Amino acid sequence: MWGNIVEYYHITAPATDGVFASKEPSQETMDSVDSQWKESMDDYNVMLVTIGRSSTENGTYLPGVDGVDASQDLNQTDPLGLSDDERDLINAAVEAKESNGGKVIVMLNNANAMEIDEIKNNDGVDAILEVGLPGGYGFYGVADILSGEANPSGHLTDTYAVTNANSPAAQNFGNYEWINADPTVNINAEEVEAEGIYTGYKYYETRYADTVLGQGNADATAGSSTGKAWNYDDEVSYPFGYGLSYTTFEQTLKSVDVDLANRTVTAEVDVKNTGDVAGKDVVQLYTSVPYTDYDVENKVEKSAVQLLDYEKTDMIEPGESQTVTITADAQDMASWDSICDNEAGTTGNWILDNGTYYFTVGNGAHEAVNNVLAAQDQKVDGNKDNVQTWELGDFDSSSFAVTDRKSVV
């Protein structure tokens, strides 16, 4: 009503040079409002706990303790990590569940990948549901998933790291202003992305592959969350591309055809519903390209695996199958070489190294890289039978030297 003042809790991203301050009420405060809330478990056997992080224009979360309002004293080591208020909320729900039965589901109402390893490892939490920022109407879909009216088929679009601040991108992140910059101008800062392509899964999966292959000093303590040798399982809670369903699926990569003349990679994948309820699945096609002495010498950056494309199935009934065809852009196999001559008479070109190209499908980037490593006779938990290969005999700097619109790169 007019003239009425309403206080509400709204989690927002701080300004670029600001710190994150939790605006959630403490569990003690909520108990004081309704001390009998736990009795609701007598009538309803599922408790939903929502943890949120929003986003805003010209706002960001500074990595690590530098991005947290220390005066709140909430035992928070990163703005995207849990605070004591959030831990208390989850633990209160778990305690109520243990007293009255039922289940606890934590929903992530967020715009940023959070640090949720302690939720994952909490035996009292039965499920974690990533809902993102669906808006008011989108929550009808969330309700359908929670009730079983709909079968989830989404997959993570980012790596959920144990400690965000340990990645190269976070270490390099900051608000670096020009000397004598005009503070009223919104272009008074820059950031040199020294990490190159190694952000998200391209960092975590590449470093993991290097640890398996014993190369690049990848198992050093630098960037380790434990202070010990770097270990993938200590650094990643959930990998890029990971997702769950109320049923199970089996994917089989039947064939891959690379057509450089038409700039396409075409894959056929059989998807079978091996569970008890109907559902949709997502086919993710990954490639692993040769990493040669030339690349090392010329500092060509390559990821251990690269997502080429993906496709969702139709609704598949239990026991039924569907063949999915994915046609990807072959340029996504190429790597940028900053010193290679191009057709404009300068340097900088997309290249394909000669050697073996691996293709695979999987429930996320980590499953994909393990499939490739298994095909390379490494002792990992991967399926080498779900890998197809393609050989390129000669170094190729011409296939993608001109764009599909005939412009020189």
Where in the sequence are the language-model features?
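C-terminal non-catalytic regions of proteins with extracellular/luminal or membrane-system context
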Residues: 1-409
